[in-house]
Amino acid sequence: MGERRSFDWSGLRSGGAASGAPEAAPGAADPAPVPPVEPNDRPPAPPIPLRVNDLKQYAYCPRIVFYQYAMPVQRKATFKMEHGKAVEEKLEQLERRRKLREYGLAEGTRRFQVWLTSERLALSGRLDLLISTARGGFPVDFKDTREPVWHNHHVQLCAYALLVEDSLGQPVSTGFIYRVPRDDVVVVDITPELRLETLSMLQAMRAMIQAERMPGPTPVRARCTDCEYRNYCGDVF
């Protein structure tokens, strides 16, 4: 057998190297300090939550959205607002009498007053009617008007389509606008171009609100007559 060596116990002192982490080598550099977080390094702020109806208002007159978000003011109730509330209470009863074939659909399930929200889009809204089929969803927006369907209505309907896809997982290729006084249906194709325009408008609205810069008024002065914010547009009246 070889020579038996005795173990050196002298290094096991309280606080010595054997009792914890090894001692740093002579001349070793200290760990680099963690740099402070600069303002530009912080994660971006979440997008401003908006409502679908804001898109229609922004296309109608961008100042409406500005007054609601960047400079909240007390608005005056107009005849259009009060009349619109009364009509909404009757629409569901009228719609239940309609047949799905009037939308060009053979089958489907109808849901009224569907609340939709998307955290990814930072968007929410209440859809008047959603028709769900095996092919996907068909959003329906009710309008109490005999006038033509304007482009801002297309944008609003497209926003509902984006919400149906994002929150319910139902693909949408077509939506409908039901004009109650005329009892007719306007078909709106949810095209890639309309989708891009809708998303771009949401981005422009948020930039306006963050900048707190009042936009110009609508060039169509007839729209100002029944506006609930007309008293605040000193450069128009």
Q: Where is each model-derived feature located?
A:
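Hydrophobic transmembrane alpha-helix bundles
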Residues: 86, 112-117, 143-145, 206-222
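Cysteine-cluster motifs in flexible loop/terminal segments that predominantly coordinate metals
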Residues: 55, 61-65, 213-237
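Short, charged low-complexity intrinsically disordered segments located at boundaries
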Residues: 85-89, 94-100, 118, 187-195, ...
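Metal-dependent nuclease catalytic cores that hydrolyze phosphodiester bonds in DNA/RNA
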Residues: 1-137
